Regions:
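Conserved phosphate/anionic-ligand binding catalytic regions in large, soluble enzymes, centered on
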Residues: 34-47, 51-52, 96-100, 183, ...
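Conserved PLP phosphate-binding loop immediately N-terminal to the Schiff-base lysine helix
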Residues: 1-36
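Conserved PLP-binding catalytic core of the aspartate aminotransferase-like
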Residues: 124, 137-166, 184-187
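Noncatalytic alpha-helical scaffolds and linker/capping helices
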Residues: 167, 175-199
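Flexible inter-domain linker/hinge segments
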Residues: 190-264, 268-276, 281-285
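Active-site C-terminal subdomain of aminotransferase-like
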Residues: 32-137, 142-144
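Pre-Walker A segment
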Residues: 285-294
Length: 294
């Protein structure tokens, strides 16, 4: 069996794993509109050929450690009626399990395939600009094939580079004393890229976005996507704030919520968390915290 870990946004530009022979595909949907939240929670996914559906384990238990270093087990994946019967299912999935997947789904519906491709192109374009800026210095870029992430072997005075990064309020991922990794996303601005290039090379960068994907893209040309995706009607209808708001309202009208009745069964997340407790989750001090920040 071939198992492939992948990135949903990258797959808008790159061939999907199924087209290159993958049997099982895993990944996270976090970058589809879900804040980093200091590492979670995020909705992961595991997909396989329909012929393997009945061979998948009904439960996957993950082993971890608690704050005291003790072995701890948690339910990482469970198969429910809704995963098998889909729209024919008659039972519900707890909010805490479905909420993050719903958020990622709405993000995909709002942007649609064209919007997601635009976001992916913008992310890759800025990564290419960063690549060119670093390549022109004496640092060595480890990976010449990339979508949004560069691994860089630094040369020169590393302590000076760290100081420039600190002065610019930039944190990057340090693997060791001279090997770093930088990932770009849709929240990264051209100013951020310019500051990164200057901090790493001490060279100012100008005309950052005057760069075409046709000049030197980091994607393998043989791996570019040609097939369509997200062909269902709902991914092509709700691309304005008003349309999206009304669509979500129509869906919510089909459900039982605290604004119209008590919730006698299930949805423990909604029963136990008041609005005043849930509001801070959206604060940038919580939502925008990167899991690797010091």
């Amino acid at each position: 069996l071939l198992i492939c870990a992948t990135d949903l946004l990258a797959l808008t530009l790159m061939k999907p794993p199924g087209e290159i022979g993958a049997d099982i595909v895993i990944g996270s949907s976090q970058r589809f509109g879900v804040p980093m939240g200091f590492g979670g929670p995020h909705a992961a996914f595991m997909a396989t050929h329909e012929s393997f559906q009945r061979s998948m384990p009904g439960r996957i238990i993950g082993a971890s450690k608690d704050v005291s270093g003790n072995l701890a087990y948690r339910l990482a994946l469970q198969t429910r009626e809704q995963h098998i019967r889909r729209e024919k299912a008659t039972s519900n999935i707890c909010t805490s399990q479905a909420l993050l997947a719903v958020m990622a789904g709405f993000f995909a519906i709002y942007h649609g395939p064209k919007g997601l491709i635009g976001i992916a192109n913008d992310v890759h374009k800025k990564t290419c600009v960063l690549f060119n800026g670093i390549e022109a210095s004496n640092h060595k870029i480890v990976n010449n094939i990339f979508f949004d992430t560069l691994s860089i072997r630094l040369n020169g005075d590393v302590s000076e580079i760290k100081k420039r990064l600190l002065d610019a309020n930039i944190n990057i991922n340090w693997f060791d004393e001279d090997l770093v990794s930088i990932s770009i996303d849709e929240a990264t601005t051209s100013r951020d890229v310019a500051d990164l290039i200057f901090a790493l090379t001490k060279k100012p960068s100008s005309d950052l976005l005057d760069y075409s994907l046709d000049k030197k893209a980091g994607l393998n040309k043989k791996m570019l996507r040609t097939s369509s995706f997200m062909k269902q009607e709902r991914f092509h209808k709700y691309h304005s704030e008003t349309e999206m708001m009304r669509y979500i309202k129509r869906l919510s009208d089909k459900d039982i919520a605290l604004d119209r009745s008590m919730i006698p069964l299930g949805s423990c997340t909604m029963k136990l968390n008041s609005a005043s407790e849930m509001a801070p989750v959206s604060w940038p001090e919580f939502a925008n915290m990167h899991p690797y920040c010091p």
